Amino acid sequence: GYGQQLDKVLHVYGSAYVKQFYDRAFKLEGRFDESRLVYHTLRAYQEVEIGPYRIYPIPAQHGNFEEDCLIFAIQHQEENKALFYVHDSGIPNTRDLLFLSNKGMIFDLVSLDCTGQGQENSGAAHMSLQQNLILIEKMKTFNLVHDETRYIASHFSHNGGLTYEAMKAMSEVHGIVTSYDGMVIEY
């Protein structure tokens, strides 16, 4: 089985669409071990609490664009800190930003997809630095960020064509930190 070294149950969270892949993998492997791995299906806009975290799954602008992929607004309820995790997604639509605003979300940290790096437009399913800047301005319009919010550009690939140094130089002038493997952020 899977997770034999685990002394606790591993809880996995994702969309119904991802659950199909999860189930398929176990079926192909001929292994099911729900005593060690438990899948929880998340639905867009339905708040879920996991430990001290309040989480709002939001449809990503990715995949089939039918709520099959999710991005996450995560609030640590005890510390009253919030993270907007926007990877594998284009710019969230106005409806989604309004939803988060109506929930009173104000993000202390925003982790941005920047697959397109310095390209003018990375398409609808990912973002570039230029699209990151557009999203940041939209979040300001909806009062989803404050003056001390930290922005991290991440989720790069060779498709963007920039080295780490070039990406860092391009993003830091906009107050955006370029991530790297092993990076730890305290906020």
Model-derived regions: residue spans:
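Active-site regions of enzymes building and remodeling cell-envelope glycoconjugates
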Residues: 36-40, 55-56, 171-178
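Cap/insert and terminal regions of metallo-dependent hydrolase folds
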Residues: 90-183
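Alpha-helix termini
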Residues: 1-7, 28-32, 76-79, 102-104, ...
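Hydrophobic packing residues within well-ordered alpha-helices of enzyme cores
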Residues: 21-25, 167, 185
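Short, conserved catalytic or adaptor-binding loops enriched in Gly and charged residues
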Residues: 29-34, 48-49, 169-170
